[in-house]
Amino acid sequence: RLYDDVDKATNHYFRMPCFNSGYREYLFNEIREVMEKEPDGIFVDCMIPKPCYCSNCLRKMAEKGIDVNDDAAVFKFQVDTLYEVFSQIHAIVTPKMRLYINSYSNDWFSEFEGHIELECLPTYTWGYDFFPAQAPYYRNLAPGKELVYMTGAMVTGWGDFSGYKPDAALECDVYDAMMYGYNPSVGDLMHPRDGLNR
């Protein structure tokens, strides 16, 4: 399928793995491997429904009678595919363990999550006014669920190995979380050469 919009066709989502391919089982095996370490929870990132026209998806859409030229139908097919994937992940993860699926919409997959996470790296593209504006809105998305403010120790974004935020910036993030009734979660990255710092 050809896109009229070059940016749409070549942005990073163009390279996202297809969950109707062998990648699905690869992901499940990774989750099973992590589960052996008895973690506090599983966070599945970047689970965003995007159109895919690989041979696996084309075959499955043909089996379901989906017109591949109908963008809305193709998008719904991908949402349904991810719903199926999340159902399977939910079955793998121990019921008492935390599970969060990071996606554009909490409505699609909220039944699999025991809490809501609001992601914000103020020193990156979000800015310091993002969290205070979004926190009350997110609280209303899932009444009664735990709220988590997910920030990070890195300065310029996820994947930044060059430096850490100053203490004052991290304290500001944690204080913001507590002020709005969120539990703070400070993300870190495992350096390719070593493990996480404790």
Positions of predicted regions on the chain:
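Hydrophobic targeting/anchoring helices
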Residues: 40-45, 71-75, 81-198
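Short, structured coil/loop segments at alpha-helix boundaries
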Residues: 20-21, 54, 193, 197-198
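Active-site-adjacent "subsite" loops/lids of carbohydrate-active enzymes
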Residues: 1-37, 68-75, 79, 83-87
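Aromatic- and acidic-residue-enriched segments that line the glycan-binding/catalytic groove
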Residues: 1-10, 45-69, 115
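Short acidic catalytic loops
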Residues: 27-28, 33-53, 184-185
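Residue-level detector of solvent-exposed, low-hydrophobicity positions
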Residues: 30-33, 60, 191
